C-alpha cells in the first residue's frame, strides 16, 4: 500500500513539473565546465556541471537566475516539490526570467569522477530532526514553530509518510569537506557564466558560499545574489557545535580581500558583546578597520532565514559580516515579512510560492 502511495506521489511530481508552462517555456540542458583526467582504463571527465534550462518565449527580465542546491540535494529542489506542486524554477520562468538549475559537480547528473573528496549521505533520521519534522524533536528553540513541511497524518515529515518518503528518495551523496565542493562549483559556475553571460545567483544552505566564490571569480558577471539560509555563521559553527568553520569569513576557500589576505589567520576577528535577541548567537565580525571583499563591493545581496529553522539563530551574522565587508546586503526574517512556520527546506514547503514572491519583489527593487 505504501509503495503505491509513493508511486502515486512520484507520478504527481512528474506531471506537475513536466507540464508547467510547457507551451510557453523552452526546456533544455547542457554541461558547464569539466576537464579530462587519466584513469587506469583511459580518460574520463571530471568537474562538469549539469545545467537544466527553462527559457520563456518572452524573457522580460534583464538577467537569468542560476539556482544552486545545497548538501545532498539536486536541482529537483527547484523543479518541483515532493507532493507535486510548482517549484521555483517554473515560478520564476513565469515571471519572465530565463532560469538555469544545476546539479553540483559530482552530484546527481553531474557524474562523480571519484577524484575529489570523500562521499557521505544524510540519514533519514537527520532529515526528520533538522528539516522535515523539527517541531516533534525541538532540537533548537525555534523548531517548535515548524508547520510548513507538506504531508498529512501522524507521520507527517517522517518515514512512512509518502511525501517524506518521496523527499528522502531524492537525496544523493555529498562530498566532504565542503572546501572540495566550493572549488568545483567556483570553476564550473565561472564556466556557466562565461557561456550564458551576466546572471543572478540563487543559493541555499551549503551552496551559500558558492554564490560568494562565483562572484569572486566572475565579479562582472554576477549581478545579484539571493542566499536562502546560507551556510554560516562566519568563522565558527553554531547550534550543532561551535567548531571552527568558514575561516575566510563566509567561505572555506580563499577570497579576495582589500587589504589582501594570504592566510585567513590574518583576518582579525572579534565577538559581539551581546546577541541581537533571545535564542540568537553572538556574531563574529572583523575587528575594525575591516577588510573589504574586493570583488563583492556594492553587490546586491539578499540573505533570508526561516522562522523555525536552525538558521534562524545565526543567518543575521552572515548578513552583518557581508555588510561590514562592503557588500550591499539585506537581511530578511521570513516571519517579519508575514511568512510563518517555515523550516530549512523553504523551496519545497507548502508556502514555497509565497517565499518565491518575496524574492521576486526584492529582485524587482534591487537588480538593474
State where each predicted segment sits:
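Conserved alpha/beta-hydrolase "acid-adjacent" motif
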Residues: 210, 310-317
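Gly/Ala-rich beta-loop-alpha elbow adjacent to hydrolase catalytic centers
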Residues: 202-211
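Catalytic active-site module of serine/aspartate enzymes centered on a nucleophile-bearing elbow/loop
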Residues: 339-341, 345-368
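Short beta-strand element of the alpha/beta-hydrolase
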Residues: 61-70
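N-terminal cap/lid segment of alpha/beta-hydrolase-fold proteins
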Residues: 22-60
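Short substrate-entry loop that stabilizes the transition state in hydrolases
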Residues: 71-83, 89, 100, 108-109, ...
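Short beta-strand/loop motif that positions the catalytic acidic residue
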Residues: 297, 303-305
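Conserved acidic catalytic loop of the alpha/beta-hydrolase fold
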Residues: 134, 150-163, 169-172, 177-200
